[in-house]
Amino acid sequence: MPNIVDRFGQLVDDAIPKPELARQLLLLGYRAKDVQLLLAPEKELTPARQYAAQIAMDAMIAPLAHPQRAALVNIFMPCELLHAFHLLPMFAEATACYLNGAAAERGFIHYAESAGISPTLCSYHKALLGMGLSGTAGKPLFTACTSIACDANNLTFRRLAQHYGIPHFYLDVPYDHDEYAVAEVSDRLREFAAFLEDATHQKLDEAALQQAVAHSGRTLELLQQAQAAKAGRNLHNDVTSEFYEVFVTHTMLGTPQAEQYARKLLADIEASPMGGGTRLLWAHAVPFYQAPVRERLNFSAENQLITCDMNADTLGCYMDPDKPFESMAARLVNNIFNGSAQHRIQRALELCRMQQIDGVVYFCQWGCKQTMGAAQLFKSCLLYTSPSPRDAHES
């Protein structure tokens, strides 16, 4: 017998031909969950993880409720500029995961495929395309994306911009991690600022941008301390919390909420006891919606999810509020997902040594060609690099 979530998902699917009704149903469900997270948070979660669930839910509701202030972006788009303009980012991975949590993703994926989108496209992007092409997401102000980390970005966001008749901004990031690439991306980010001024009919508040970059700098510094503090500790973690943290480490960078989460997380980790079972690093997105993954990893003393590499992609990045464009550009250029897979492999090895990792799960999510293409290289480097990890598994 279907449970209440499955019934809700079916209601949303049935309402897709009436996109405004589908949007309002999703908002109703998301807001109900938001109230639950505030009044009755999951007791097993630490304070930081409870807070992450709340702010991630708020960040999902806001652009859906106010599409006229929303920007459809990819996960790696620097959003400090959006925060300076008081705009609301919506990104593919979050959209797809929350639809899945509401048991409503199938209808939107089917809608996208019926509109001519390839079945082999990234499932995250198909969900966003389904919401956009059906009209359920509402009409955003514009779309913007980077070339990091996959070729689906240009297709997805350009197609949605054409569908809505709205502007599109594409930020091509050079593969080389050097000062010339940083200078080039800095110039493009200044062009993006001008693009935002045209889209919003407002001038950039440079003080607001500097404040956002300062928030990012403090957030990243706290998160780096938190990653280092994980060594040898029993973290009592769950897979969904790692997904929520993706908001903080990407589209929410530059907000006081992200900084507050990082501060809470560091305190939680430092208060955690030493010891624990098998310590795992997860590479790529965590499929928290799959019951077998939750059963084996959530709050487990035997198998602990220590880190997801998506939440450690910019460790060590210094943000200078007096040089906001250069700082955002350097963070983007030096991201481990930019360029060769060796950058990502080296970060995984750093985390394994830092956090005393026993094994790595490399998740080949359907449609992510970059991740699947690097799987064997990743595995061989991990297996033959001493002293850890001791094991590596593909899924």
Model-inferred region functions:
Residues 131-132, 339-355, 373-377:
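A short, acidic, amphipathic alpha-helical segment used as a generic capping/interface helix at domain edges
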Residues 73-76, 145-149, 282-287, 364-366:
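Structural motif
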Residues 52-53, 57-60, 70-119, 129-133:
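An N-terminal, globular interaction/scaffold subdomain
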Residues 126-195:
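Acidic/His-rich segments in extracytoplasmic proteins that coordinate ligands and/or metal ions
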Residues 81-110, 284-348:
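Redox- and metal-dependent alpha/beta enzyme cores, enriched for Fe-S-associated oxidoreductases
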Residues 2-69, 186, 190, 194-318:
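A charged, amphipathic alpha-helical module
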Residues 384-389:
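Conserved small/polar residues in nucleotide/adenosyl-binding loops
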